[in-house]
Amino acid sequence: MRTLIDSALFVRDPEVVRSRAAEYGYLALRGIPGPEAVVPLCTLIQEVAESLGLLQPTRDARAAPLVRPGAALTGTGYDDARWLTLQERVLADPRFAAVGDCAELLTVLEALFAGPVLTRRGDICRLALPSATHLTTPPHQDHWYTGGTMNLWTVWIALTETPIELGPLAVLPGSHMSGLLPHAGHGAGRQGVRATDEEEFAAAPLAAGDAIFFNCLTVHRALPNVTRDRVRLSVDYRYQPANEPIHVVRVDGTRAGV
């Protein structure tokens, strides 16, 4: 597996930001938004997940929390009642919006789009339980699920220390240049593209507050959480240029969600 190329040194140079994004289909930014920015949100998610019986109590918001013994998500994970409750409670809390709207992220996105940014384009919080590799997000392109503008970008943020064995995000560099690929599969969030050689994906151990920006056509996946008892916590925020319309038609003319 390849290593992510860090672009954090270039975030103040819009031309380099756009050049790297066009070449790689992603931007890995270590320290952006940074650990302090995500502590309140991480604490919130841990508290809600604890109340739902998914996590053990913890006092260290930067360390990957421990799973509650016997906790597991049913079905595809996305249709588990506790997962849905987690989304409802977390996404409605100002601490979730505060991270997605922080200046550190929006500055990069404004450079990327060369203009104003539209937020709230499909945000979600995630937790990856151990012993649940069957629920690991398969390789896919976000455009398959969202449709709309080809300039939709996702920002994936690690909320705790996330070594490779905890299952961080992996991206396929340059895959955005191949257009929309065929997706297949059954169940919510389970449609994906044909498996690509794992060695072609890029990933890296991440610290709390590290972010990976990627285009809606960039093939990406989660790596499996192969730890014994730790839970990966992360969030996705999605953005597009404010001057482009919102719709769900894919580039091939089909409609997302159908």
Question: Where in this protein do the model-derived segments appear?
Answer:
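Non-heme Fe(II)-dependent double-stranded beta-helix
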Residues: 1-23, 30-139, 145-146
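Short, solvent-exposed loop/turn segments at secondary-structure junctions
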Residues: 33-35, 125-127, 144, 162-164, ...
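Active-site rim elements
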Residues: 93-98, 197-202, 222-223
